[in-house]
Amino acid sequence: MQIYPLRLLPNKIDFDFMNFKAVSYSFSIILSLISFIWIGIYKFNFGIDFAGGIVIEVRLDQAPDLPKMRGVLGELGIGEVVLQNFGSERDLSIRFGISSEENLMKNIELIKASLQSSFPYKFEYRKVDFVGPQVGRQLIEAGAMAMLSSFLAIMVYIWVRFEWYFGLGILIALVHDVILALGFMSITKLDFNLSTIAAVLTIIGYSVNDSVVIYDRIRENLRKYHKKNITEIINLSINETLSRTILTVITTLLANLALMLFGGEAIRSFSVLVFFGIIAGTYSSIFISAPILTMFANRKFNNKVIER
């Protein structure tokens, strides 16, 4: 039995993506500048992981209903409250930020009273600690190093698999995606915490995967069509992979939509940022990383890529 691939678009689609190269570059530059300016003026809404706060360690007599507990504490109006199990499922860590020193003890007592009145558990409060912003700075540095390391590893991988020009194209696209993601996070006031660092790394991985698929087709078409110029080759390659690109982005967005709707407040920043990043990564793989290869369009470049 012959298996036919699922296609959303006709086989012979011929949309001239390269004709919009100048428009897409201008659009991306404008969005990047807006992101830079907004971040410079309004900064980020740093979560407890980076801004510091209070940590309450408590042991319960049974496993708690964490989603319900998050909902109850989230309605107290004291800002972000993070609940996590540690050790056993009966051990709970409650973290929240410090709005002011005057409200510190009041908020601690408010949390205790709310838990006691809303749940039938027995609570044994074991420790109350202050986590300073110094720890937050260390986490920011670690997150920045993680992103930088991923950039370098991706550059080396693309250089080995294709050619350094391709690595430069992907690097520009990734910087574009990260800037837009950070700008989106600042504009929407999403909590900047460890989960958003994971979201940015997820966006980087998705964007690279999309670009590599198009790059593979460009290399294949360079071998097949010796008389076509690089602009025609890139345009043909984007069109040939367009059905796959659309199917991938739809299925990924649907999976992420489930996280946004049912994942709860604990992963809200992660799921919303990844949703935006998937769209940005798809856009950059088509309109940034592929068209930018025309800057290196010469015969020597073509021969090097074909040999790989």
Curated annotation (Swiss-Prot):
Q: Where in the cell is it found?
A: Cell inner membrane
Query: What is one GO cellular-component annotation here?
Result: plasma membrane
Topology in the lipid bilayer is annotated as: Multi-pass membrane protein
Kindly list the GO molecular function terms attached to this UniProt entry: protein-transporting ATPase activity
Q: GO terms for biological process? A: intracellular protein transmembrane transport; protein targeting; protein transport by the Sec complex
Q: What residue intervals traverse the membrane?
A: 22-42, 140-160, 164-184, 194-214, 246-266, 272-292
Question: What InterPro entries does this protein's entry cite?
Answer: SecD/SecF_arch_bac (IPR022813), SecD/SecF_bac (IPR022645), SecD/SecF_CS (IPR022646), SecD_SecF_C (IPR048634), SecD_SecF_C_bact (IPR055344), SecF_bac (IPR005665), SSD (IPR000731)
Q: Which domain of life is it from?
A: Bacteria
Assigned keywords, A-Z: Cell inner membrane, Cell membrane, Membrane, Protein transport, Translocation, Transmembrane, Transmembrane helix, Transport
**Family assignment?**
Belongs to the SecD/SecF family. SecF subfamily.
**What NCBIfam families does this protein map onto?**
2A0604s01, transloc_SecF
PANTHER family, per this entry? PROTEIN TRANSLOCASE SUBUNIT SECF, PROTEIN-EXPORT MEMBRANE PROTEIN SEC
Instruction: Name the HAMAP family on file.
Output: SecF_B
Subunit structure, interactors included: Forms a complex with SecD. Part of the essential Sec protein translocation apparatus which comprises SecA, SecYEG and auxiliary proteins SecDF-YajC and YidC.
Relate the protein's function as given in its record.
Part of the Sec protein translocase complex. Interacts with the SecYEG preprotein conducting channel. SecDF uses the proton motive force (PMF) to complete protein translocation after the ATP-dependent function of SecA.
Protein name, per record: Protein translocase subunit SecF
Its gene is secF
